[in-house]
């Protein structure tokens, strides 16, 4: 029961950070989409918008709606790719809960950033191919026609995790409502969320060392650590259930930090979360009817095809397969030696670089 309570607190803390960004930025994150005029800027906007909103599922759903409203698919595709990178900020924040223990922090940080490394590599390979040959756009267009119909699914009723976390979310939001304006309550929520994560991850680490032994450890290793296919399937299944890859990766990072799973075992699991998160965009697309329904389904299919092709190409080729863990381990070693690398990495990749690129495009 203690583990369940701590996991609930962890998810509430992650949610508080997302809510804080939403409150602090208002509609500014959504307004960023208006600057998407070319593929590179679209990629940067998808990245920073997801980092601000703290939900690739939400961003994907917004993009689906914008495509239905007339946004060219060729611009929407880089937005989706950027959202894939931006969503990994959450698990990187969670890894900070191990910052006081050097070895644990190295393991947790590498487990969090292997997701970033894979998504960045996938973009570096597939975005140029998409700009020149349009394989995702063409393939998704062919699939969209097969899936567009009269049936639709209500995403809100399907997201039971949001319902479960609503009491904690409301309580945390109420605790900052006395602050003036929207900026300060938002900042306060972010600070509360990070503080909760630092406390909960430390507590989870201590508890897991005691409970994850014997049968419990064998069950976890059978579902996550038995092999790549099992790991990917588990990551996909859990993410489909909770409709949030951020939530799934946030749960697995403490397990890596405490040494219960190796980076080699975590890596395929995080790839599965990429597939699972596509369900939200697909559900959003089914809710759109009329002449734009097929376009909306097309961009949702792009999200799925991008993640599937990324896994087939990168994980399927041994040389490429080794690159994300190598990049993550190198970054984690640097971060363990000097925490300024953590600040530079998180601030630079998720905010400074994309905002500078967006600013330059407007000159």
Label the predicted regions.
Residues 1-43, 47, 168-232:
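Helix-loop-helix hairpins and the membrane-proximal interhelical loops
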Residues 7, 11-19, 23, 42-43, ...:
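Transmembrane alpha-helical segments of multi-pass membrane transport proteins and ion-pumping complexes
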Residues 27, 31-35, 71-72, 76, ...:
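Membrane-helix interfacial "entry" motifs
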Residues 23-26, 62-65, 96-109, 205-217, ...:
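Juxtamembrane helix-loop transition segments at the membrane interface in multi-pass membrane proteins
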Residues 50-84, 99, 144-154, 158, ...:
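Membrane-interfacial helix-loop connectors
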Residues 53, 57-61, 161-186, 273, ...:
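Long, highly hydrophobic alpha-helical transmembrane signal-anchor segments
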Residues 8-12, 93-162, 195-202, 283-363:
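Juxtamembrane and boundary regions of transmembrane helices in multi-pass small-molecule transporters
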Residues 7, 34-38, 46, 50, ...:
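Alpha-helical transmembrane segments of multi-pass membrane proteins, especially transporters
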